[in-house]
Swiss-Prot record:
InterPro entries: TPR_IFT80_172_dom, WD40/YVTN_repeat-like_dom_sf, WD40_repeat_dom_sf. GO terms for cellular component: 9+2 motile cilium; axoneme; ciliary basal body; ciliary pocket collar; ciliary tip; cilium; intraciliary transport particle B. Residues 495-514 are annotated as: Disordered. This is Intraflagellar transport protein 80. Component of the intraflagellar transport complex B (IFT-B) involved in flagellar assembly. It is found in: Cell projection, Cilium, Flagellum; Cytoplasm, Cytoskeleton, Flagellum axoneme; Cytoplasm, Cytoskeleton, Flagellum basal body. The keyword Cytoplasm applies. One of its GO terms (biological process) is intraciliary transport involved in cilium assembly. PANTHER family: OUTER SEGMENT 5. Pfam families: TPR_IFT80_172. It comes from the Eukaryota. Keywords: Cell projection, Cilium, Cilium biogenesis/degradation, Cytoplasm, Cytoskeleton, Flagellum.
Length: 1079
């Protein structure tokens, strides 16, 4: 966590009940003068503006709620599913500032709970971001008493907690000090409610938090309960503190955990799935927790505030990232006060002392402890309400790495990208504080992404193919470093400007070109019209940052590239090869072009828990809505491919890969047309490293076509059907996979079926998978699993070597979608085991203020149950055809995040499975066969067998089955290889795949299917085929009797059902038998 800027201000006094109603706009109540105040915090965090917006209210406000920005009622907020339309009527929109003080306005409904038991509904107009005057204007308000709902007109029921349920706020949860919880639903009008739920909890209700549109957590006394308002308010989770002297006073949640703020014990992190404690973060000595808040973005962190002004930043699994204090780590800045007409105001509160009006003289005074704290709606930045003023802070996202390239936030708005291959580090200035960092998980091309409050920035580092294309004379050319990413693509942001800041270059005797440092800089939104043309000097937000002078040109330069306009703050971005997906906080998902960020289409996703529930390739976009509903759309049009199937468990991880099936068939057809056997590869060449394996000489490609310098994948045709593989991991750690098609007609009749209609469960050695990920642009599925005795013994280990059961292995399944194929599993296990016990022990010391061994041990046990591990990205290998350099430019590697990204590491991926995949997809089966023969590994032979089945290559299938030791099946393949036309069903039956019989049956070749099954002595399968086609029973009885008689087994029909079948169908002429064989 970077430092904190505090704004000392005794006027207005005692601000509490912080509630955000805009991306830079919050509302708070003063307990001294009983007025409401608006607080404007621009994303730059350079200043804070405060203004009074209401008259004194008769009773003290002790709780307040409003819908977060982007969650209002709109056309795209329908719960019926995604709509192919842009969200044009959001309750709050990011609008560009105009020259006038009044811009487009929206409305907000604020609900306040008072100490006298009344609810105050305030309807307010909210002006756009460009105005310089007061932003919130109260239109009308109405008060109602909760006594009419609770009973007892004379009793007073202080409203201690409120929560407006998302997405449209039609439901309102009210918690009372007397222990009653009310669920009110809007009926027809703004102030007309119907009571749905009334429950007496027998303890004061301290906090209510909306987990999603259906679930809410209620804290009362020392207990917390999670209810589902759509399932008869059933209880899904319950938890109670062990000590009676403590209470849960604050709540926050991420996609997987629920954070409880306890005054004395500290912050308790509960797993939402199991209800178990996974971490406890105690407060400092003689201090107490007053508030907790979570980020609504992909980083999934949360912060804890204490009464004495300590702010603790944590990861999702409860491990401490950083800590700061208001007293020692904050920079003091003045607060700006404005009146309703925009003029500076010196006195806002009716009760303020005139001697306290000049806050600039008290700039060095302390703001005191913290009353309330909340993240901004876009995450990253947070606002604290203190005893004597306000404070803003910033929690930077964690560093990300692809193995060779690293992206990290080095300042409030500066991003550094480091390329370890070229030893290059570039620093870029973002328009606002950087909130989240992303890597392209599914794209073959590595892309880096960053989000701010209102913009998206995408970098595309140069590929190894581009780097290797430079001349090697005189070593690595300097032009490589100079031409490294100079123009990051970005979306429209606050100031809507890009100003190139010219860096002064020294004369070079080597004739190097002058380099222009591209710097993203934006106008301060709150500047008055006309200030844009002046030179300004930015104040440092934090003491640790050096001041930086920004040069403003007299004329604003337009954006260098066309970009989509982000209406609401982005929450997730998913980077692909041709398309990116930008999901904002309202649920609107914009599919944009990868080259320009220009908008392609927009859909609406009502509920999305994590960016691990989205997967995108060029032909399909899959996502999980509401945790259990899987939907697939075409990113090129926004139309449904699959409207929705229901999974029986919540989905944790979703990944998508491009199927090899279509590539192999296309390559096979191309080879057949050209009359060659696997030498039609034109998209890559192999170097001398693999010359002994594949029979290829370095620098002398044997292909007739020209070869390029890198091993890359064949591009997928846009009209390919059956072109992708989908895999998901649910909360029970069960893996489901399926090969799907891009044709919507294939799923038109599914409706709301179960996911098992398109996916099948996959198991491997009874190991528990923690995370799954396809290697980019392939169907090779990588799984991060726990170490077990059934796995091959590891040759090396990362981490400690003895006394640990916290070990992981990475495995690659080369054919994740398979039926009952009787072959060796094509699964490759990395020879390195990962021991993360040291990471767990480091995380277990969650207390940064005390040294209690028993406390640390307890925390370690809790963290051991978390097991939040992630595969961030898997980069496939790249080869170079050059005798002067190493051929393997980039080896296949995976980037893993252990224990909630507490530690990131790079692990090698088995190379030969990737190489065989590329060879097979390119139709280069001769080299693939040489590779298998040289290595002679059963998983590699099994992978080769699956590719031969897809290509209907019976000749090479015979070799693969021989390598697996399946002599009978190889002999059968040899017997049918002499046929002019080898049927795909016969090929599948050769290895015992029941799908082969289905293929032959669908083609009307029942006789051929029965003959193939009998040749493999699979008489039970042949009998199953005949039961649906009884006219072929004589053929089955004839073949079975003949095969047994040839072995001298004349009594083969003495048992049922063959005894009765031979009596009924045994006397048939041979002419009829031959006729049935041809059928």
């Amino acid at each position: 966590m970077y430092g904190i800027s505090s704004f000392y201000c005794r006027d207005p006094p005692n601000l509490t009940c912080l509630t955000w109603i805009g991306i830079d706009l919050a509302v708070a109540a003063s307990q001294t003068d009983r007025c409401l105040y608006e607080i404007i915090v621009p994303p730059s965090l350079g200043q804070v503006r405060v203004s009074r917006i209401s008259d004194p209210i008769p009773s003290t406000i002790i709780s307040m709620t409003a819908l977060p920005p982007g969650n209002g009622s709109s056309a795209s907020s329908s719960t019926s599913g995604p709509a192919v339309m842009a969200n044009t009527a959001s309750s709050y929109q990011i609008t560009k500032g105009s020259g006038s003080s009044s811009t487009s306005a929206s409305q907000a409904t604020i609900v306040a709970g008072c100490a006298n038991g009344t609810l105050i509904f305030i309807q307010a107009d909210v002006l756009g971001l460009g105005c310089t005057s007061q932003r919130v204007s109260v239109r009308r308000q109405k008060s109602i008493s909760v006594s009419s709902y609770v009973g007892g007109e004379d009793a007073i029921h202080p409203v201690t907690s409120l929560c407006m349920m998302q997405p449209r706020g039609s439901s309102l949860l009210v918690g009372l000090e007397t222990g009653t919880v009310l669920l009110l639903t809007m009926m027809g009008g703004l102030y007309q409610f119907r009571q749905i739920l009334k429950s007496n909890l027998n303890a004061p209700v301290h906090a209510i938090n909306s987990i999603d549109r259906n679930r809410a957590a209620i804290a009362y006394g020392g207990s917390v309960t999670v209810i589902n308002i759509t399932k008869n308010n059933s209880t899904e989770l319950s938890y109670k503190l062990q000590s009676d002297g403590d209470a849960i006073t604050a709540l926050a949640n991420t996609g997987r955990v629920l954070v409880l703020g306890c005054e004395h014990r500290g912050a308790i992190v509960l797993d939402l799935l199991s209800g178990l404690e996974i971490s406890v973060i105690p407060p400092p000595p003689y201090d107490a927790v007053v508030s907790v808040s979570s980020q609504p973005v992909a980083s999934n962190g949360f912060i804890i505030a204490t009464r004495r002004g300590v702010v603790i930043g944590c990861r999702e699994n409860g491990t401490v990232r950083s800590c700061a204090t208001l007293e020692y780590d904050s920079a003091h800045l003045p607060v700006s006060k404005i009146a309703a007409d925009g003029a500076p105001a010196t006195l806002l509160s009716p009760l303020a002392d005139s001697s306290m009006t000049n806050v600039d003289e008290n700039l060095g005074s302390s703001v005191g402890g913290i009353r309330d704290l909340a993240f901004a709606p876009y995450g990253g930045s947070f606002l604290c309400l203190c005893l004597n003023g306000l404070a803003v802070g910033y929690l930077a996202p964690q560093r990300l790495s692809s193995g060779y390239i690293t992206i990290e936030v080095t300042g409030l708005t500066t991003v550094m990208i480091t390329d370890a291959r070229l030893q290059v580090s570039e620093v870029y200035t973002a328009p606002e504080p950087v909130i989240s960092l992303f890597l392209s998980r599914f794209a073959h091309t590595l892309r880096l992404g960053a989000t701010t409050a209102s913009s998206v920035i995408v970098w595309t580092p140069p590929t190894m193919a581009k780097i290797s294309s430079f001349s090697l004379e005189g070593g690595m050319p300097l032009v490589t470093k100079i031409q490294w990413i100079t123009e990051p693509v970005r979306s429209t942001s606050y100031g809507d400007m890009i100003r190139p800041s010219t860096v002064q270059n020294q004369p070079s005797t080597q004739g190097l070109p002058n380099r222009q440092q591209q710097e993203l800089d934006f106008d301060n939104l709150l500047e008055k019209p006309g200030d844009t043309l002046q030179q300004t000097e930015s104040r440092p937000l934090l003491k640790s940052f050096s001041q930086k002078k920004l040069e403003h040109d007299k004329a604003s330069n337009p954006p260098i590239k066309t970009a989509a306009y982000v209406r609401n703050p982005p929450r997730y971005i998913v980077l692909g090869d041709s398309y990116h997906l930008v999901v904002d906080i309202s649920g609107e998902a914009n599919i944009v072009s990868a080259t320009t960020l220009a908008l392609v289409t927009s859909i609406y996703i009502s509920s999305l828990d994590s960016d691990r529930q989205i997967a995108i390739i060029d032909s399909a976009l899959a996502y999980v809505e509401g945790g259990t509903t899987l939907r697939i759309i075409d990113p090129r049009s926004g139309n449904f491919i699959l409207r929705g199937v229901i999974h029986h468990k919540a989905v944790l991880d979703l990944t998508i890969g491009i199927s090899s099936q279509q590539h192999i068939r296309n390559a096979s057809e191309t080879s057949a047309k050209e009359g060659t056997q696997g030498n039609a590869v034109s998209d890559f060449a192999l170097g001398s490293v693999f010359s002994n394996l594949t029979g290829h000489q370095a620098g002398k490609p044997v292909d007739a076509t020209a070869s390029t310098s890198s091993l890359k994948q064949t591009e997928m045709s846009s009209n390919d059907a059956s072109s992708y593989v989908l895999a998901l991991l649910d909360t029970s750690n069960s893996l489901y996979v399926g090969r799907l098609t891009t044709s919507p007609q294939a799923y038109a009749k599914l409706g709301n079926s179960m996911s098992t209609a398109i996916l099948q469960q996959s198991k491997f050695l009874d190991s528990i998978p923690y995370s799954i990920q396809f290697i980019a642009q392939t169907d090779l599925l990588c799984m991060l699993i726990s170490e077990s005795q059934s796995l091959p013994q590891a040759l090396s280990q990362i981490g400690e070597t003895v006394g640990s059961d916290c070990k992981l292995r990475l495995v690659v399944d080369a054919c994740p979608v398979r039926t009952s194929i009787i072959t060796e599993d094509p699964v490759f296990v990395t020879p390195t085991t990962i021991d993360y016990s040291s990471v767990q022990r480091s995380n277990a010391a969650v207390s940064i203020f005390e040294e209690d061994p028993s406390r640390i041990l307890a925390a370690y046990r809790m963290l051991s149950r978390s097991n939040i591990h992630t595969i961030h990205r898997i980069t496939p290998m790249v080869l170079k055809n050059d005798g002067l350099m190493s051929n393997a430019i980039t080896m296949s590697h995976a980037v893993l995040g252990l224990a909630g990204d507490s530690s990131q590491m790079v692990v090698a991926v088995p190379e030969f499975s990737v190489l065989l995949n590329y060879l097979a997809k390119s139709g280069n089966t001769q080299r693939a066969l040489r590779l298998c023969r040289f290595l002679d590994q059963k998983p590699l032979w099994a992978q080769m067998a699956t590719y031969c089945i897809e290509a209907n290559n019976i000749q090479h299938l015979q070799s693969a089955l021989s390598g697996l030791g399946m002599v009978a099946k190889a002999s059968y393949c040899h017997s049918i290889s002499s046929h002019n036309e080898v049927n795909a069903g016969a090929v599948k039956l050769a290895i015992g795949d029941p799908e082969g019989a289905n293929i032959l049956s669908s083609q009307g070749k029942i006789g051929a299917a029965i003959l193939a099954a009998c040749d493999l002595w699979n008489f039970s399968k042949a009998l199953e085929l005949c039961r649906g086609n009884k006219k072929y029973m004589p053929l089955l009885v004839y073949l079975r009797t003949k095969y047994h008689n040839n072995l001298g087994m004349s009594n083969c029909n003495n048992e049922e059902p063959w005894l009765s079948l031979s009596r009924q169908y045994g006397n048939v002429s041979e002419d009829e038998i031959h006729r049935l064989m041809k059928g």
